[in-house]
């Protein structure tokens, strides 16, 4: 459990560092090519790694092709293209907004489970969601609530970032459909399909 928590922490920290780097890169390349180049390279590395670890049989779809295309599209097309498009359109403030929107993923996951699967969260989860939301608001605004008055000028950008984040949440939840597969196998096949769609 501790190893899993550490893995999640490292992934979150990596994501946080990704947006400042992307801010510089997006001055020279649009979000579509940025996503394609990044995950095209990642897909090749994952294919080699999966082939070495699990062999050719790991590339069999086992009747889950449509699901893999859907979840791959959610992660590697919807998430990557929209979150970087929103960040690019917002300019410098997009770095902070995109980073903080990532912090809302647990809240979004709980809301999706509550609305779609009727899995009502426990009281402590709702309390945690509210605290997380308030914390995110204070970080985004730096305590300056007049920030909300400027949202009308950035609604499209915010919508792109939010939809992108929802896409990633759906992707991670989709891992349950392949629970008998390794994380590497699910990641590789969805990355290949998602990058192809991009």
Model-derived regions: residue spans:
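Glycine-/small-residue-enriched transmembrane alpha-helix faces in small-molecule transporters
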Residues: 1-36, 149-177
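Residue-level signature of transmembrane alpha-helical cores of multipass secondary-active transporters
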Residues: 7-8, 67-72, 98-99, 129, ...
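Cytoplasmic-side transmembrane-helix entry/capping segments in multi-pass membrane proteins
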Residues: 9, 63-70, 121-133, 181-191
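Hydrophobic/small/kink-forming positions within alpha-helical transmembrane segments
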Residues: 13-16, 20, 47, 72-77, ...
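Specific transmembrane alpha-helical segments of multi-pass solute transporters/efflux pumps
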Residues: 14, 18-19, 54-97, 138
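Specific alpha-helical transmembrane segments that line the substrate/conduction pathway
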Residues: 33-44, 83-120
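Transmembrane alpha-helical segments that form core, pore/gating elements
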Residues: 46, 106-115, 147-198
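Hydrophobic transmembrane alpha-helices of multi-pass small-molecule transport proteins
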Residues: 46, 121-143, 198
């Amino acid at each position: 459990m501790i190893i899993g928590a550490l893995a999640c922490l490292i992934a979150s920290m990596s994501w946080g560092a990704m947006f400042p780097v992307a801010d510089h890169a997006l001055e020279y390349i649009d979000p579509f090519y940025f996503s394609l180049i990044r995950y095209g390279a990642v897909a090749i590395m994952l294919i080699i790694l999966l082939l070495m670890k699990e062999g050719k049989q790991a590339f069999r779809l086992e009747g889950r092709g449509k699901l893999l295309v859907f979840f791959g599209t959610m992660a590697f097309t919807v998430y990557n293209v929209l979150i970087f498009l929103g960040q690019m359109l917002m300019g410098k403030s997009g770095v902070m907004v995109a980073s903080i929107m990532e912090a809302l993923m647990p809240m979004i996951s709980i809301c999706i489970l509550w609305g779609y699967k009727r899995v009502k969260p426990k009281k402590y989860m709702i309390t945690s969601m509210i605290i997380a939301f308030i914390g995110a608001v204070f970080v985004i605004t730096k305590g300056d609530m007049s920030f909300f008055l400027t949202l009308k000028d950035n609604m499209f950008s915010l919508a792109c970032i939010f939809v992108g984040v929802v896409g990633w949440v759906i992707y991670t939840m989709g891992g349950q459909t392949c629970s008998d597969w390794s994380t590497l196998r699910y990641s590789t096949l969805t990355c290949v399909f998602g990058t192809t769609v991009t």
